[in-house]
């Protein structure tokens, strides 16, 4: 699909469709007013008859509007003008795109990017429109024997900006939005893949393919034999019950002018299926445990977006691939594991396995002498209880890094919120037999999980993103969300000095 920006009057647009907004109650947006004037009040007369109230997401497709060069005009309900916020704006864009796609408008000029969204500029509106468009048109149907086809799908979308001086900003927003959308799609595709296909070896194959596609990327795969030599006993223990070999994929992107500049390291939990192991999960909903690798999928998607943007920064992405299954060789509650760092862990629950994989991955990345490390993981159900399905949890040992990530989440509208990590929570991890236990009980489960990880991240600035509530959706809209790719790319845009705000 082709995107572009322009600055022009609606009456001069010769397109299959023009998209303009209508506010409640039946009040035309400034652009719609221009079309109404040209058409001698044709549009306002329809509104007076009650054809469109202007409620959020309402659509009215008009044909052959008098005086308008475009074949069609799509009126889009935008709700009350003063209440138009970020979420509503993105939902309106998605509904608009779906309507255009379903009604055979193969190209359109969209004036919704001229609407006033509280606290947001043209760059944000255009970029979010691109991301929302791609998100709304996303499908995962490769395993369906009969694939649905759109007869005349939307192929070209032009976003109008208020002034010509904003054209460069709009073009930058499209470039960024397309790269991020590409990363989000890659993340979704990996997450939605069935676990009989998307095992650790599949993750590794995708990492290799990324290196084949981009000159700035190199990939290294670490299998169980090398992990054994490295002393990654905790990581290896989790995968012992599965016939699928554990594999850690190291994706290195070098874009900084100084190739020796310290890298930012992203570590993704890649449990391609988590049965819970010996501490078996309930059967209901267990199919969704294929999404336990969404941390790794989001790191993969971020690396892809990064390569597309060719940002001047060095980044290393780690996909910690593993499968947690019960079996005669599976690790057990009561086992004591010696981690790569030399610290010992008493296993009280084999379903708290993500931290046992991540702790060795966090120790491994010390060798890169990182500028900072951010791990991403569907780690705790407690985070879903604390923050629901809308906001990602952030925990960190470094205040400036935590602030950077939360700020990036605000800029990208991929929301995150910082949770505390006080010393008192470490008390819950004490073990009478080892240096620590792998769980700390029900109270503050997200925090104690982060406290566990922090014991392996003392040699660098570190942050942990718990995406257990935000990585996928259940129910009718079941599927990977592609989060937090947008937030991570924004973080890297900021780190590389890219200006994304007016």
UniProtKB/Swiss-Prot annotation:
The coenzyme or cofactor needed here is: Mn(2+)
Chain positions recorded as Mn(2+) 2 binding sites: 269, 274, 292, 353
In its keyword annotation, does this UniProt entry include Metal-binding?
yes
A cellular-component GO term for this protein: cytoplasm
* Enzymatic reactions: Release of an N-terminal amino acid, Xaa-|-Yaa-, in which Xaa is preferably Leu, but may be other amino acids including Pro although not Arg or Lys, and Yaa may be Pro. Amino acid amides and methyl esters are also readily hydrolyzed, but rates on arylamides are exceedingly low; Release of an N-terminal amino acid, preferentially leucine, but not glutamic or aspartic acids
The record's cofactor note says:
Binds 2 manganese ions per subunit.
Cell compartments where the protein resides: Cytoplasm
- GO molecular function annotations of the record: manganese ion binding; metalloaminopeptidase activity
Kindly list the cysteine pairs connected by disulfide bridges.
none
List, alphabetically, the InterPro entries matched.
Answer: Leucine_aapep/pepB, Macro_dom-like, Peptidase_M17_C, Peptidase_M17_leu_NH2_pept, Peptidase_M17_N
Q: Residues that bind Mn(2+) 1, according to the entry?
A: 274, 351, 353
Q: Which GO terms describe its biological process?
A: proteolysis
State the Pfam families in the record: Peptidase_M17 (PF00883), Peptidase_M17_N (PF02789)
Task: Identify the EC number(s).
Answer: 3.4.11.1, 3.4.11.10
Where it mainly occurs, coarsely classed, is cytoplasm
Q: Which UniProt keywords apply?
A: Aminopeptidase, Cytoplasm, Hydrolase, Manganese, Metal-binding, Protease
Catalytic residues?
Answer: 281, 355
The similarity comment for this entry is: Belongs to the peptidase M17 family.
Function description: Presumably involved in the processing and regular turnover of intracellular proteins. Catalyzes the removal of unsubstituted N-terminal amino acids from various peptides.
What name does this protein carry?
A: Probable cytosol aminopeptidase
What's the source species for this entry? Vibrio vulnificus (strain YJ016)
